[in-house]
């Protein structure tokens, strides 16, 4: 049986945290900032956590990642 591989695109987008969560960066941060408030832009710089409903799918894609 072939080896199970890590989904490389997902591995570049998510980082594991110390207590088993997954950290991700926010969308809407590359252009069109004139329609966003200063507060929105500041909050989008911070990383977010992956929601519990998506966690199972993403952990499966990253199963071989340490």
Swiss-Prot record:
Cellular component GO terms held in the UniProt record: cytosolic large ribosomal subunit
Compositionally biased intervals (Basic residues): 1-16, 31-45
Signal peptide: none
Alphabetically ordered keywords of this record: Ribonucleoprotein, Ribosomal protein
Entries under SUPFAM superfamilies matching the protein: L35p-like
Region span, Disordered: 1-52
GO biological process: translation
GTP-binding found in the keyword field: no
GO molecular function, one term: structural constituent of ribosome
Protein family (similarity comment): Belongs to the bacterial ribosomal protein bL35 family.
Name of the protein in its database record: Large ribosomal subunit protein bL35
Source species taxonomy: Bacteria, Bacillati, Bacillota, Bacilli, Lactobacillales
């Amino acid at each position: 049986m072939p080896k199970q591989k890590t989904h490389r695109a997902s591995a570049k987008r998510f980082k594991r945290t110390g207590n088993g969560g997954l950290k991700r960066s926010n969308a809407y941060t590359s252009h069109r900032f004139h329609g966003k408030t200063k507060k929105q832009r500041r909050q989008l710089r911070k990383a977010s956590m992956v929601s519990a409903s998506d966690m199972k799918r993403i952990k499966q894609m990253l199963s071989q990642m340490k």
